[in-house]
Amino acid sequence: MSRYLELLAASSQRVGSSLCVGIDPDPAHLSLEHAASVAGLREWVRILINATAQYAAAYKVNLAFFEAYGAEGVALAEEIRALTPAETPIIMDVKRGDIGNTVKAQARALFDALGADAVTASPYLGIGALAPLLERDDRFIYLLCRTSNPESAELQELRLTATEAAPEEELYLRVARLAAARPEALAGRIGLVAGATAGGAFIKLREV
């Protein structure tokens, strides 16, 4: 079992829950006081963490909402590691994906500067392009596979022709098949993002 999965399992056992708390400070759902400034946002984050720390097996941070506040917002995102219990894993929901040195920079930013234990990433430039993220054997990657947004079927359910290594199938199933074949998957360092609104997809994904 990978370090991340061990950390997550221990955290879940400690709090008696599998709850992952989203830190998604959408200004549309915050009070004016909390949305108006980074200081207000920091207070909202503190209240949320204090109210959920005894129940949360993990925290998922939507970094875009912090980036929208500029440099001070990103600095607040860096503080989240210190604000949450040290033994509770943090997932950075960033859906990153690029190539070469850009992914190396993303890995440093997410894992080192922000202290993420796991991140979400897009496989659509090729899973191998994410090597700098995958090479961190103490971290975990959730690959976008079958997402819950209404537009997802436009690409994710496209039928692909069969190859020597795979049958004819939808694109999201091919992503899952390619991910499962990676050595990082065997080491417990790759997971999939599959939206709960696509219940039928779960059955197919478990068969891959």
Regions found by a protein language model. Name each.
Residues 1-89:
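Conserved N-terminal beta1-alpha1 strand-loop-helix module at the mouth
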Residues 26-27, 32, 98-193:
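Conserved anion-binding
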Residues 44, 48, 76-80, 106, ...:
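A general structural detector for well-ordered alpha-helical segments in enzyme core domains, enriched
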Residues 68-83, 99-105, 124-138, 199-206:
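Active-site-adjacent beta->alpha loops and helix N-cap segments on the catalytic face
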Residues 85-88, 182-187, 208:
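Short helix-capping segments at alpha-helix termini
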Residues 89-97:
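Long, hydrophobic, well-ordered secondary-structure blocks that form the structural core
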